[in-house]
Amino acid sequence: MSNILAVFNPPPQRELEKEETMDCVPCQVMSTMFSVGFGSYLASGKPFKYGKKEAKRGISLTEFEKRNPQWWKVTLRSFGGLLIAFGFVRGTEGWLWHKNKEYKNYKKLSNDGETQAN
């Protein structure tokens, strides 16, 4: 069944195994990088800088300020700060706190074609 059809006709519910719900190191690294990176972008205020691109499109500075009111700027910058904090919390989980956390074990293919557990 295709993924699109699965939205309208979902498969029956099933119990997930522990291995399926465990966190993995690559997932943790990617979520940390995304959170810190995008949070830094939002917190820096760069999305609200009037530049050549807006001037070229014919948007004046006053029109640009109308499209980005102060409450919107503060909200997104605050959300950026929260994303940065979440990224650091997520990134330090497992080695600074919650040290007994278990991660998924991946099997990789060795040179001779046999699978090995990491």
Swiss-Prot record:
Source domain of life: Eukaryota
Main location: mitochondrion
Any GO CC annotation of this UniProt entry: peroxisome
Cellular location(s): Mitochondrion
Leader sequence segment: none
Keywords: Mitochondrion
InterPro entries: Mitochondrial_unc_protein
Miscellaneous information on this protein: Present with 752 molecules/cell in log phase SD medium.
Similarity comment text for this entry: To S.pombe tam6.
Protein name in UniProt: Uncharacterized protein YDL157C, mitochondrial
Organism listed in the record: Saccharomyces cerevisiae (strain ATCC 204508 / S288c)
Organism lineage: Eukaryota, Fungi, Dikarya, Ascomycota, Saccharomycotina
